[in-house]
């Protein structure tokens, strides 16, 4: 696990040290706050695993989330046309972000998912590390925001995504 702390003022570092073990290593890095996209770029450079999965500090993973992602990754491990695994995001009240879905699995580009199949809502993406390293976010002085859609739309031009209809991420959005 790589944890990039980009400016928290709480006890995140102490908490990580408390969770660390040889079976559950956490690599903690504290960097100045230059925006989420910069923190993601930093984490990508440190990543050594096969898949890169982003979890925001104020969100949670439901039980069996990582297990479900690993199961899905095994289904497509030999298919190099698929670079992204997408489970579904749910609100903490149990509703799926974007409403209910009527599929179990679908393989398509992120652009087709939204514009051809008209599926709404955010998903929780795990990206092959070898692929995401080719598509870093642009970084500009004094710019602290870059939409994640930029990254996924760039990847969608060359690769497909394996979408699976399971809750792997719990979130709340600011309104």
Question: What annotation goes with each model-predicted range?
Answer:
Residues 91, 95-175:
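Conserved nucleotide-sugar donor-binding catalytic segment
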Residues 5-14, 56:
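A conserved acidic beta->alpha catalytic loop
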Residues 31-47:
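Glycine-rich, basic loop-to-helix element that forms the pyrophosphate-binding segment
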Residues 12, 40, 61-69:
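Acidic donor-diphosphate engagement hotspot in glycosyltransferases and nucleotidyltransferases
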Residues 64-99:
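Conserved donor NDP-sugar-binding/catalytic core segment of glycosyltransferases
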Residues 52:
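Short aromatic/hydrophobic "clamp" motif used to bind/position activated sugar donors
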Residues 1-7, 27-32:
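Short beta-strand/loop segment that forms part of the nucleotide-sugar
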């Amino acid at each position: 696990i790589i944890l990039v702390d980009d400016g928290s003022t709480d006890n995140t570092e102490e908490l990580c040290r408390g969770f660390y073990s040889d079976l559950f290593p956490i690599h903690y890095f504290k960097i100045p706050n230059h925006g989420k996209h910069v923190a993601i770029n930093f984490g990508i450079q440190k990543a050594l695993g096969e898949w890169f999965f982003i979890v925001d500090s104020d969100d949670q993973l439901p039980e069996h989330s990582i297990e479900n992602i690993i199961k899905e990754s095994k289904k497509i491990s030999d298919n190099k046309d698929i670079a992204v695994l997408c489970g579904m995001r749910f609100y903490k009240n149990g509703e799926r972000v974007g409403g209910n879905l009527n599929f179990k699995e679908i393989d398509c580009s992120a652009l087709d998912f939204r514009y051809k199949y008209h599926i709404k809502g955010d998903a929780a993406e795990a990206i092959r590390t070898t692929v995401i390293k080719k598509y870093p976010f642009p970084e500009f002085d004094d710019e602290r925001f870059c939409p994640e859609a930029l990254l996924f739309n760039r990847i969608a031009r060359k690769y497909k995504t394996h979408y699976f209809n399971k809750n792997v991420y719990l979130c709340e959005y600011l309104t």
